[in-house]
Amino acid sequence: MKRAQIDAFCGCRETLYQRIVFFAAPAILLAGIVYVAVRYAQLPAEIPSHYNFYGEIDGYGSRGTLWITPVIGILCDALMLAVSFFPQTWNVGTSVTVFNRALVYRRVRDLIADIRLSTAVMFTAIAVWQTALTPTFPWGMGVLIGVCCTAPLVRFFVRLAMKK
């Protein structure tokens, strides 16, 4: 579907926030790829690849494994972008009526944008952290991952409850 068709189907126009995220999420992922590419030649052939519960390194792998995280991030973003073009496939969790159609679809479009942005931040942060060769697992990374996983849902449900 084209954007105009999606807007007509949803009964609402794409917001400025959604347009910004449309470009910001891939830009963030690209920044992570550039960082890995710039640092790649300076890295040893074998790098830490796994950490135990105490944050100590307990596994090593090839530096080529650094590309896995950005590629997964790109695939996740591409999948979410593809889903955003087919609103009729969204499971919105409520009955969509003539009266609530615009609100429900606007909120779900925002949720998809939030998930794209959070996913891009999370995968880029992981790629940068892996490339930095930190000797222990930074526990702040766990907090970042937790926030990236829960913030879009919290924002969605709070805004849905407010019904603005």
Question: Which sequence ranges carry the predicted segments?
Answer:
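Short, Lys/Arg-rich, polar N-terminal cytosolic tail immediately upstream
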Residues: 1-14
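Select subsegments of transmembrane alpha-helices in polytopic membrane proteins
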Residues: 18-26, 79-83, 108-120
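Interfacial helix-start motif at the membrane-water boundary
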Residues: 56-76, 108-113
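Cytoplasmic juxtamembrane regions at transmembrane-helix boundaries
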Residues: 86-110
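Membrane-water interface of transmembrane alpha-helices
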Residues: 39, 75-95, 154-164
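Alpha-helical transmembrane segments of multi-pass integral membrane proteins
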Residues: 121-164
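Short, basic/aromatic recognition patches
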Residues: 16-44
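Active-site and channel-lining beta-strand-loop segments
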Residues: 36-68
